[in-house]
C-alpha cells in the first residue's frame, strides 16, 4: 500500500516537472520571437546612422554593429522593450557623430523612446522642434556638444521627463513659462549655456520633484523664490556664475534633504541668516563665495554638524571667526579668504585638511588642542596677506603631509627653522614672500623632490643658495629675488629638468654666467630675471643656443592653441592648482604678476656688469616677449638676429656702449611696442616702422649720431644725417648669422652648422632659417597646462 502510494507520488512529481519545463521552453521561444527588433525600428535607426558622415575606413565602434543582417535590439547603445520589440533606449554617448540633428531625422520615428543620451557626440547646430514629438522620453541627455538655439520650448512638451541634461552647449533664450509642465522632473542640468531668466520665482516652486538643480554659468538675473521649502526632495542646488540678486535664501536651508549648495559668483548681498535650519540637516558642502554678503560669520553655522566643505571667500564679511566653529567636527575644508575678517585664528583649524584665510586682517594664532597638531591631517595652509607677525610658526613643522604652505605678505621675522625639513616630503608649493625672514635659507630640501614652486623673495635672507635644492627635480619656479644672498650663479640648477622660472633679481650674486663644462644651458627655462646683481664677464656667442623652451611655441607643445591665452604657470588641475606670481620690470614699469601667463617668455639681465658682444644666438629665441639687457657694458653692434624675434613686445638695450646702427629689420616687429636704445653710441637712421615712429624721444636720447628723429623728437632735437652715414648703413648681412651656424653645429654636428651657415650667407634668409630650425626643435610636452 505504501510502496504503491510512493510510486504514484513520484510519477506526479515527474509529470509536473516536465510540464513546467515545457512551459518554460515554450515561453522562452515565444519571448525570443518578441525580442526581435521591428523592421520599422531597424529602418529608422539605419536612417539615423546614415545621417552622420562616418568614415567607411574608420567606422565608429558603437555604430559598426548597426547593419541589416543583425537584430537591432542587440546593437550597441540600443535597448528594446521585451514584449513589443520597440526601441525604448538609445545611448550613443562619446560616439563622434559630427553633424546636426535634422528635422526629418530617423531618430524622431522612434516614438517609444524613453531614454535618449547623445552626450559628447560632437553634435552642432540648432535642435529641431521635432524633439518635442518624443513624448514618452523620461531621460534626455544632450550635454557636452556644440548645440545652439532655443531648445526649451520643445523640451517643455516632454511632460514625462525625469532627467534633463543640456549642460556645456551654447543654448540660448529665456526659460518659457511652459517649463512648469515638467512636474516629474527630478534632475535638471542646463549649466554652461547662454540661457536667460528674469523670474526664477515663477518657475522653480512648481518643480516640486527636483532632487538636483544645476543652472550654473548662464545669464540669469533673477531673485531666488522667497519660499523654496516645497522642494522637499532637493539634494543638490547649484546656481553658480550667474547674476542672481537679493538676500540670503533662508528658506532653502529648511529643506532636510539638502546636501550641496553652490551660490558662488553672483550678486547676493546682506547678512548670512540660516533661519530655522533643520536639526537633521544633511548639508555637507556649502559655497557662498564671490558675492556681496556682509556682517559677521553667524554663530548658528556651527549647528550644521554635517558640514565638510565651507567656502565664504570673496565677500564683505567682518569680525572674528566664531569660536563655535570648533563644533563643526566633520569640517575638512575651510576658505574664508578675501574678506575683512580680523583677530585671532582659532587653533582648532589646524586639524583640518585645507585652510585658506588669505587677504584678511588676522594678527595672531589661538591655542591649539593636541589633536589639532598631530600632523596627520593638514595638506594646504594659506595665511597669505594678513597681519600675522612674530617668528616662523614652529607648529607647522609638525604637519608632515603638507602640500602647500603660503605665509606671504605678512610680518613674520627671524630665521626659517631647519625643522621645516619635516614638512617638505609632500610639499609642492612653499611661498614665504614679502616678510622679514633673515639668516640663511636652510638646507631643508633633501627630500623635496615633489616641490614645484619655491618663493622666498622680498625678505632679508643672506648667505648662499642651499645645494639641497638640486633634489627638487620637479621644481618649476625658484624665486629668491630681493634678498641679500651673496653667491655665484647657481649653474648646477641646469640639471633640474622642469625649471621654467628662475628669479635672482636684486641680490648680491656675482661672477660669470658662462662655464666651459656646461655646454647646453637651460633647456626648459621660460623666464629668467637676474637683474640688479653683480654678475660680470662676457656671454658666449652660443650662450642661448639650447634654450629650447624659448624657441618652442605653446601651439607646438600642445598641438593646439585653443585657450592658451588663459593658461597660467602653476595651475596644475584638481590635485594642485596654485598660480605662481612674481614681480619684474615689464614695459619699463615694475609690475606685479599675480599669475604668470603660460605663453610668457622673458630674459632680464639688466643692471649687471656684462661686457663684450650681445650673443647672436639670442635671435634663436623666437618666442621671447621681453628682453632687457640695459645697464651693462655691452659693446659692438646690436645683433641683426634680433629681427627674428617676431613675438617680442619689450626691448631695452639702454645704458650700454653699443655702437653701429639700429638694425633696419627691427622696424618690422609688429608687437614691439616698448623699446629703449638710450645712452649708447648708436648712429645712422632710426628704422621707419610704425612702432619706432610712435616712441617717445627719450627712447633714443644720448645717441648723438642717430638721425631720422624729426617726427619723434621735433627738428630742434634731431641731428642731421650725412651721406657717409647713409652709405655705411648698407652693411652686408652675411656677418650676422655665422655665430648661429656655429651654435647649431656645436650641438647636432658640424655638417648641420655648415649647411645653415651657407643659407645665411645669402641675404634676407633669416625667417626661412627660423622656420626650419623651429620645426626641427619641435617637442611634445606631456604636462597639463594650468
Curated annotation (Swiss-Prot):
Disruption phenotype: Reduced basal defense leading to an increased susceptibility to the non-host bacteria such as P.syringae pv phaseolicola (Psp 1448A). Increased susceptibility to S.sclerotiorum strain 1980 and to the related fungus B.cinerea. Impaired SCLEROTINIA CULTURE FILTRATE ELICITOR1- (SCFE1) and flg22-dependent ethylene production. LRR repeats lie at residues 110-133, 134-158, 159-181, 183-204, 207-231, 233-255, 257-279, 280-304, 305-328, 329-352, 354-375, 376-399, 400-423, 425-447, 448-472, 474-496, 497-524, 526-546, 596-621, 622-645, 646-669, 671-694. Glycans are attached at residues 67, 98, 115, 133, 181, 199, 206, 276, 338, 413, 422, 434, 447, 471, 558, 628, 644, 676. One of its GO terms (cellular component) is plasma membrane. It holds the Pfam family LRR_8. The chain crosses the membrane at residues 740-760. It is a single-pass type I membrane protein. Residues 761-786 are cytoplasmic. Keywords: Cell membrane, Glycoprotein, Leucine-rich repeat, Membrane, Plant defense, Receptor, Repeat, Signal, Transmembrane, Transmembrane helix. Residues 1-30 form the signal peptide. It is found in: Cell membrane. GO terms for biological process: defense response to fungus; detection of molecule of fungal origin; response to fungus; response to mannitol; response to molecule of bacterial origin; response to molecule of fungal origin; response to molecule of oomycetes origin; response to salt stress. Receptor for microbe-associated molecular patterns (MAMPs) that induces a BAK1-dependent basal immune response to necrotrophic fungi (e.g. S.sclerotiorum) in the presence of MAMPs (e.g. flg22 and SCLEROTINIA CULTURE FILTRATE ELICITOR1 (SCFE1) from the necrotrophic fungal pathogen S.sclerotiorum). Functionality seems to depend on the presence of the receptor kinase SOBIR1 as an adapter protein. Required for full non-host resistance to bacterial pathogens (e.g. P.syringae pv phaseolicola). Belongs to the RLP family. PANTHER family: LEUCINE-RICH REPEAT RECEPTOR PROTEIN KINASE EMS1-LIKE-RELATED, LEUCINE-RICH REPEAT-CONTAINING N-TERMINAL PLANT-TYPE DOMAIN-CONTAINING PROTEIN. This is Receptor-like protein 30. It comes from Arabidopsis thaliana. The gene is RLP30.
